[in-house]
């Protein structure tokens, strides 16, 4: 590994370990998270001041809203005595966690950098050693905010998406520039630091949110059934710019029924890049008129977690619409909201 710069060794950091592939060890039933932060740090160069918390040892497929709240609380506690935080985390739900922490820890004044690996750090060829090393560097040199450091890239947390199952460059920055990269033992910034307001922490959420991906022929009855399941908000991955069926199987009318029952519907696209908008085509006119909320250029992960976070504040439909359109942490380009 490359030597760590003087700037890194001067900073006091804190690692919060949550499990994931990076911490996995063999077991009779397959790989399972077993290493804590202290063991993980043995695989990266020394010379830095790092405290650590072993929060839990979980496969990230099991990370749920309760764990997001625990992580946020751990960050708030560690923030009192450090200048940067690294969270080791499984890759499968890392983008959801990074998005939710971006909302919960809005305008945090220190960097919170999530990282993990595609292969366990105990393997000689693991990407975990490089990723953890790079995350430590990033957490030492970034400004406040929530980020993912993976491979050489550093990505804004609420703009990251896992796009590959096994490749080492597993994450991409969607509809937003990469924040920077780690090279030669230092962080290289690609963007100017954003102006920050006073740190605002809000961890109360309503997890009763459903994500529905439309396919040609999706039953309207299925869409309408979410109301009977106690769901309080729906994110719909529609076709292209936001198209839905409006004849034979009328998705638009079914979603309107949900809205009429005070269940907010957020419309996003199955396309990974560029913004969705229900304002372009005739097929979505029913939704436009009924108050569907456009996700604009948000990622699906950001739209889902933001809706949970907004519903933690309010269930008033007008306020939900206003908050979903507001840019809290760089998750949405307000100019793209139709």
Identify the meaning behind each predicted range.
Residues 114-183:
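Internal gly/pro-rich beta-alpha loop/helix module
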Residues 241-338:
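C-terminal non-catalytic interaction/assembly regions of soluble proteins
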